[in-house]
Amino acid sequence: FDENKIKNIPLKGYFMKKEYPRSDFRSVSDVDILFDRKQADSVKKVFSELGYTFLNEDDNQYHFEKKPMMNIEMHATLVHENEESYPLLVNQLDRSTKRDGYSYSYEMSHEDFYIYMLVHNSNHFRIGGMGARMVLDSYVFLKNHQSELDYDYLNVMLEKIGIAKYEKRVREIAFNWFSKPHAELKFD
């Protein structure tokens, strides 16, 4: 992407694998990357040159596959435009910081990453359910970053997006399942 000047943010599993004590503790079934929709033709060209097949696009994702098992989801937006959280998450490419060693690859703040992870997981929960890995991801992320998170910002954003209660429940479940007795992380 750097060579083709495609601004991007790797999402979810790409960074979560690095949060675990060993990367093989966290599986990924596809790679999700946020990009600027205006660069869709360049993205298609790059993946074609790398041997990927363009499968389809929907209102916010472009899907690519390379057999036998590599799947890429290029996200033009973090959430669908009709979702309540869209206005709060739409400018993530502009809000993120450049990753070390890259000219066009960025990363979200820890707070925005956690918020996006929760929004993504809550959509799965609402549509069809979520598994233990999503709860474990929350636990691992919070354990790794609890001392550096801006909880005032998180509380405000979680309320605005409408997932504050959801976040609290997921956090309670995560710490009940995966921590020593009585360990708890509070946001207040």
Language-model regions: role of each:
Residues 1-29, 35-188:
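Conserved NTP-donor binding/palm subdomain of two-metal-ion nucleotidyltransferases/polymerases, i.e.
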